[in-house]
Amino acid sequence: MITGSLVAIVTPMHEDGSLDYPRLRSLIDFHVAEGTDGIVVVGTTGESPTVNVEEHCELIRTTVEHAAGRIPVIAGAGGNSTAEAIELASFAQEAGAVAQLSVVPYYNRPTQEGLYRHFRSIAEAVELPLILYNVPGRTVADLSNDTTLRLAEIPNIIGIKDATGSIDRACDLIERAPKDFALYTGDDMSAAAFILLGGHGTISVTANVAPRAMHEMCAAALAGEALRVREINGRLVGLHRDLFCEANPIPVKWAVARMGLIESGIRLPLTPLSSASQERVLLAMRRAGVNV
């Protein structure tokens, strides 16, 4: 099981929106050097809705190849079509990802039984370990804890990224889930509490900007060092908040560009960060000790 701080890595783009693979390779090196515990590529923060299938597959391939075993790579491979999700999962397995992150189908609003059958079908078709991704704020459909626990009985469904931010739901899963079922939060603001309560890690937006601090905070939380967690997280709270002052990944891509790690390219319908929001994010970065 991968524990700790897994970065939901941004997808570097040139100003014209074309993908910047050299910068992606540099970002991978940056995260290896900073102690990040894993990389999730082509997820929400990686702008998965606006990359085409060929680009999606190439981003997975490039990340796995350049990581070269130095850091685990989890491939974003979900979708609202079960058949297409299976195709992406199959490619991720062939490319050498250690697992796939599969989002709850969006827009078509399946029932709990539909969600169960969707994920079961992917797991039966592709052996690659599957991490469920529940983010009802984006998908509308909400994978219930009961359905999650049904899915946890399937051998290669190995965990969940719960981006609800609900500590009540997290505690219920921590209490009822199998001990080898990985529990990740997708909510940076509650990540410290989530891990201290028994979660295994976070799939983090903040880790794009403060990877060392997120790694250290998660390590302290996993060790039960609450005072150390409080100290580190106190510096990061502004980032947890202000990296969502506009729709993710608009603020975090601006922040990573401000650090000089990528260009500021982003694809429509997402637009560049407003001037007022830039001031907020820059202040949060400085308070977190980011060198900008």
From Swiss-Prot:
Where the protein is mainly located, per its record?
cytoplasm
UniProt cross-references to Gene3D superfamilies, sorted A to Z:
Aldolase class I (3.20.20.70)
Q: Which Pfam families match?
A: DHDPS
Q: Which InterPro entries match?
A: Aldolase_TIM, DapA, DapA-like, Schiff_base-form_aldolases_AS, Schiff_base-form_aldolases_CS
The record lists the catalysed reaction(s) as: L-aspartate 4-semialdehyde + pyruvate = (2S,4S)-4-hydroxy-2,3,4,5-tetrahydrodipicolinate + H2O + H(+)
Part of which pathway?
Answer: Amino-acid biosynthesis; L-lysine biosynthesis via DAP pathway; (S)-tetrahydrodipicolinate from L-aspartate: step 3/4
One GO BP annotation is: lysine biosynthetic process via diaminopimelate
Name the Gene Ontology molecular function terms of this record. 4-hydroxy-tetrahydrodipicolinate synthase activity
Where does the entry annotate site (Part of a proton relay during catalysis)? 44, 107
Domain of life of the organism in this record? Bacteria
Assembly and oligomerization = Homotetramer; dimer of dimers.
Q: Which NCBIfam families match?
A: dapA
* PANTHER family per record: 4-HYDROXY-2-OXOGLUTARATE ALDOLASE, MITOCHONDRIAL (PTHR12128:SF66), DIHYDRODIPICOLINATE SYNTHASE (PTHR12128)
In the record, the note on similarity to other proteins reads:
Belongs to the DapA family.
User: Which named protein is this?
Assistant: 4-hydroxy-tetrahydrodipicolinate synthase
Record organism: Aromatoleum aromaticum (strain DSM 19018 / LMG 30748 / EbN1)
Underlying gene: dapA
